[in-house]
Amino acid sequence: MALLQISEPGMAPAPHQRRLAVGIDLGTTNSLVAAVRNSVPEVLPDEAGRVLLPSVVRYLEKGGRRIGHEAKEQAATDPRNTIVSVKRFMGRGKAEVEGAANAPYEFVDAPGMVQIRTIDGVKSPVEVSAEILATLRYRAEDSLGDDLVGAVITVPAYFDEAQRQATKDAARLAGLNVLRLLNEPTAAAIAYGLDNGSEGLYAVYDLGGGTFDLSILKLTKGVFEVLAAGGDSALGGDDFDHALFGHVLAQAGIDVKTLAPEDVRLLLDRVRVLKEALSSAPQASLDVTLSGGAHLVQTISHDTFASLVEPLVQRTLTPTRKALRDAQVTSADIKGVVLVGGATRMPVIRDAVAKYFGQPPLVNLDPDQVVALGAAIQADLLAGNRGTGDDWLLLDVIPLSLGVETMGGLVEKIIPRNSTIPIARAQEFTTFKDGQTAMAIHVVQGERELVADCRSLARFELRGIPPMTAGAARIRVTYQVDADGLLSVFAREQLSGVEASVVVKPSYGLADDDIAKMLEDSFKTAEIDMRARALREAQVEAERMLEATQAALAADGELLDADERTQVDTLAAALRAVAQGDDTNAIEAATKALAEGTDEFAARRMDKSIKRALSGRRLDEI
């Protein structure tokens, strides 16, 4: 008789049967894949022993393609068909990347996410990223000798809903089961925390090729709690390359518009080598011949480079200050600063971090590999390979508040920013007008008080609400954010049970006003926003009062004598006169006057309703 194998949920049936899962760092410049072997996380190399896979894809005629090192070598000779730094285009519309610095690509005007025309047809960033992910998947399966049950893929903490969804789509296209989308700084903290048994407050400074993240984490007895996250989703090592690129052209008196695409790519590649050389030498030289025969020879000192990129360095410190403020800590409270991303190898970055935090940063793990290692540890745990000492908890956060539009274009925040995920929050709303049978629900993201100043994520309608007087219906709206940071919204009318929901998958074409800028604007305009909100709330209440009064007069106007009717009409006219103005106090005073002036009328209506309800009924029936 066959025996059933019974094991704990999510655990392997036998201790020696490990379920293979990997951590993937899908980077702007380079990507890596790592796995846990013999309880130790390690980065998996290719057949040549290289662990870094350049995030570059070159498309050839008739469906051919080259990925990684081979594609990177051809970037200068075939720039239009060789896609580099594709992560910067993930989840973005054409309007957002049209001005991408010195990009040699032909962007296609199509709805949704930006498309790039190549010799093999039009490609989306999702397709390009899928090629990179598939290459890493094959590397892992060859190295581990079996199929994967899934992968943890890291994303910048400041990736928005569209960018996260695009990353999951790319993984699915590559044949990968996504166990979790993990924020890059959190992955780095896992690698450091589990490796060193650290406890206390830590800052993770993550400067990659195209994005910057700063997270404040609290490590306590196996609990990884993200207290706050900040960053800039459009700032990375590429921007340092472009600053140096612009300086080289200016010194040579060359206008970038006169350069052929292959020369732009060649110069950018040489400038990147120059930047890397300046990380370990006081000066470095550039010697390059362009396609037209022009020969450029320049020597640049480290001091010159440092002055060129100082504005970029300062841009990383602005989100750093905000994250510390959000976490309600100071730089002096930070026990250690973890550096993540190849761009943090630059001395200008390490010096700036050391000066700001008053201590040298932690660099005992390779900044290029630490994110992949942390992701591998999380993947191994999620695959069910729990071992001794693996009892730890990860608490991540969302970067921006999630809210719903209410009457008057106001935002009611349901889940505030820096809330720990996964999370679900619910709030009850009601109807504004008598007999209202439907409600439009508008989901927004941002810190401002007015809908017009926030990002629209989704809209849906709840229909079938039973007709009732205004304010009688009870609609419960629930926001649910999963561990990947993706949002679902549910609405339910409590009496009838009708419900509607939406999984938020925002249009890839939405303009990203830069999440960091949204936060900055919210701080600068907080007082103005609150005044505007108070005004709109007063106007909405005035409108509700006027509509209710008008409906009452139409139904029971005979309960008032001529003088009383004149008084109510006068108060209503006074409120109507100020309701659309900008004097909040005047609107509130006029609303209060009308409410008090109709108190007796309301009492008479109540008496009439009671008499009508009791008419013709015996005492024992009541």
Curated annotation (Swiss-Prot):
Coiled coil: none annotated. Keywords: ATP-binding, Chaperone, Nucleotide-binding. PROSITE patterns: HSP70_1, HSP70_2, HSP70_3. GO terms for biological process: iron-sulfur cluster assembly. One of its GO terms (molecular function) is ATP binding. Pfam families: HSP70 (PF00012). It comes from Burkholderia lata (strain ATCC 17760 / DSM 23089 / LMG 22485 / NCIMB 9086 / R18194 / 383). InterPro entries: ATPase_NBD, Heat_shock_70_CS, HscA_NBD, HSP70_C_sf, HSP70_peptide-bd_sf, Hsp_70_fam, ISC_FeS_clus_asmbl_HscA. Chaperone involved in the maturation of iron-sulfur cluster-containing proteins. Has a low intrinsic ATPase activity which is markedly stimulated by HscB. Belongs to the heat shock protein 70 family. This is Chaperone protein HscA homolog. NCBIfam families: HscA, PRK05183.1. CDD domains: ASKHA_NBD_HSP70_HscA.
